[in-house]
């Protein structure tokens, strides 16, 4: 497991973030009680366009113009491209199924993985990427969630989602 965690650790503004794709996780309310002890965020992976989507949300959460006073909640808010915490939770909050786990340390990652089960993906980048197929279910879900029009490729989809996240910074 530690090898998978190391391979899915990314440096963003001189700080390390573990970004894991987990298939078939079981998410219940108990897991969210761990937010009081551990720093992490889980996002519904069905609506993540690419790992760059998560990295961009993390970068935006590092700004001084935050919507939430909790950095980890801010990541969810930014990833959802909304200014409302409740809306962000409704749109991208983790549910049982495929999730993206974001945290800073291996201990937290291992504790969360033990609680939610599922299959940790060896390559989170590949797992989170939306297929380049406009008829793909994940592609359609993301287009609908962000209200995008005339999107014909995954590259264009990712660009437009990142733009939606950036626009939030202008509104804060």
Task: Report the location of each language-model feature.
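Secreted/extracellular ectodomain signature
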Residues: 1-13
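Phenylalanine-focused residue identity feature
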Residues: 10, 38-40, 71, 127, ...
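Short flexible coil/turn linkers enriched for glycine and charged/polar residues
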Residues: 13-16, 94-96
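N-terminal interaction modules that seed assembly of large macromolecular complexes
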Residues: 15-70
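Low-complexity, intrinsically disordered regions enriched in charged/polar residues
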Residues: 48, 52, 79-82, 133-136, ...
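Ordered, amphipathic secondary-structure segments that act as subunit-interaction surfaces
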Residues: 51-109
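Glycine-rich, aromatic-bearing surface loops/beta-hairpins
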Residues: 94-172
